[in-house]
Swiss-Prot record:
InterPro entries: UppP. It comes from Bacillus cereus (strain ATCC 14579 / DSM 31 / CCUG 7414 / JCM 2152 / NBRC 15305 / NCIMB 9373 / NCTC 2599 / NRRL B-3711). It comes from the Bacteria. This is Undecaprenyl-diphosphatase 2. Catalyzes the dephosphorylation of undecaprenyl diphosphate (UPP). Confers resistance to bacitracin.
Length: 263
């Protein structure tokens, strides 16, 4: 298969699934297996195109991101600030640094991914069932305690297949944050976390990069960026109506597909 076509397919899958609660890792592994793109080069490629998805968040939330560093206040009164982000980053950041190699070596196989797809789906259903009325209906109403709770749930996303947005939005609901506010906080929180993780992976895999792969990488990056832009905007509109439960059932179906076609 031509490099540009691989880049187009994988970039579209990455952009569509990175910020939806369905596990981008699971979809990337499955898609790579189906099109025969699952070698060492594929692992580096996935890191690069993930940066395209991150750029989409930066573009959509650029005013918010600027306000976090004190440039251009978004709203009067109390608002989301840099400390909210730092607090949310700490739990997963510490675990990620301490267990980066263990996670990469032990949890990226088909078996662990199937388990986390199911477990993540169950968590989402439980969060919907037992969540109480929101005390933080907007991003600016999130407290430091709620930010830390969401950050704790983000630790689950270190297990491939759990889904960052699935685990953090679920944590937000259980902490009495609305669906939309939890999702927006999740996306903003993902920027420093994903940049750090992707940067570390790129440094470790730098010797695998080759100028011969430029078509593959550029096509994948651009496609992931464009599709992620559309996916994020659509998801935020959809989430207030359909909640997390349909995504949970989809995860169960994906786990079954994984079990029969990959394992």
């Amino acid at each position: 298969m031509a490099d540009w076509l691989i880049g187009l397919i994988m970039g579209a899958v990455e952009g569509l699934t990175e910020f939806l609660p369905v596990s981008s890792t699971g979809h990337m592994i499955l898609t790579g297996h189906l099109i025969g793109f699952d070698d060492e080069r594929a692992k580096v490629f996935e890191v690069v195109i993930q940066l395209g998805s991150i750029l989409a968040v930066v573009v959509i939330f650029w005013k918010r991101l600027w306000s976090l560093v004190g440039i251009g206040k978004v709203t009067d009164g109390p608002s989301l600030n840099l400390l909210h982000i730092i607090i949310g980053m700490i739990p997963a950041g510490v675990l990620g640094v301490l267990f980066h190699s263990t996670i990469k070596e032990g949890l990226f196989g088909p078996g662990p991914v199937v388990i986390s797809l199911v477990a993540g789906g169950i968590l989402m259903i439980v969060a919907e069932k037992f969540s109480k009325p929101s005390t933080a209906r907007t991003l600016d109403e999130i407290t430091y305690k709620q930010a830390f709770t969401i950050g704790m749930f983000q630790c689950l996303a270190l297990w491939p297949g759990f889904s960052r947005s699935g685990s953090t939005i679920s944590g937000g609901l259980l902490a009495r944050v609305s669906h939309t506010a939890a999702a927006e906080y999740t996306f903003i929180l993902a920027v420093p976390m994903m940049v750090a993780a992707s940067g570390l992976d790129l440094i470790k895999s730098w010797d695998v990069l080759s100028s011969a792969d430029i078509t593959l990488f550029v096509t994948g990056f651009v496609t992931a960026f464009v599709v992620a832009m559309l996916a994020i905007v659509s998801f935020l509109k959809l989430l207030s109506r359909v909640k997390l439960t349909p995504f949970a059932y989809y995860r169960f179906i994906l786990a079954a597909v994984f079990y029969f076609f990959i394992m």
